[in-house]
Amino acid sequence: MKKTVLALSLLIGLGATAASYAALPQTVRIGTDTTYAPFSSKDAKGEFIGFDIDLGNEMCKRMQVKCTWVASDFDALIPSLKAKKIDAIISSLSITDKRQQEIAFSDKLYAADSRLIAAKGSPIQPTLESLKGKHVGVLQGSTQEAYANDNWRTKGVDVVAYANQDLIYSDLTAGRLDAALQDEVAASEGFLKQPAGKEYAFAGPSVKDKKYFGDGTGVGLRKDDTELKAAFDKALTELRQDGTYDKMAKKYFDFNVYGD
């Protein structure tokens, strides 16, 4: 009798898992901004590459669904998600109170501190006094744009928003910007450690404000896609527990990108 009950319990458990996966779409369209190396970019062949891409592909594999990546400007990602043009966002998307009013998030993917970069030797610091009269580049729709607009733009700082990060770096190196505010890791790995960024460096400490920058990044999802959120969370927990996350992270970073 006990063996029969155990067998039935196992069958019920397996059936529940199968039903859970069956509720997911066969293909998950994931939106990402491909100008944000090393998280998301394209190689010479036009293939999607980066830490976000690796994470997304691994989670989809464990969820038993097919991932389709969709390139987009950053500020179009949430509108595209809400319009059902994509099913998820994996693009260094910070988990903030404001965004959670519009969409849902998975558990944390990794930390996301923000920091200024400027020419080496520049006295610029992330303070109003230092930035007054200066031109500061930010990514449209980003937490950095929201912070700069509320704290600097109305007080004498020229905050310039761009459709993608590559345009910011281009104007910075051309001298049209005095500084740029963006994700610290993206700035370090995607610009400062590259040939184009050799004459630039971080300007001052990280900019801290939980109201704007939240508690790390997550997968952006529609609020009613509860099964998809649960599946992403389960897959993320598994790959962190079995060491896959750390193995993938070491491909891109020489520090703990997940944070505390």
Swiss-Prot record:
Changing L139Q: Does not affect ligand preference. GO terms for biological process: amino acid transport. It comes from the Bacteria. Part of the ABC transporter complex HisPMQ-ArgT involved in lysine/arginine/ornithine transport. Binds lysine, arginine and ornithine. Can also bind histidine, with much lower affinity. Stimulates ATPase activity of HisP. Belongs to the bacterial solute-binding protein 3 family. Has a bi-lobal structure. Contains two globular domains separated by a deep cleft wherein the ligand-binding site is located. This is Lysine/arginine/ornithine-binding periplasmic protein.
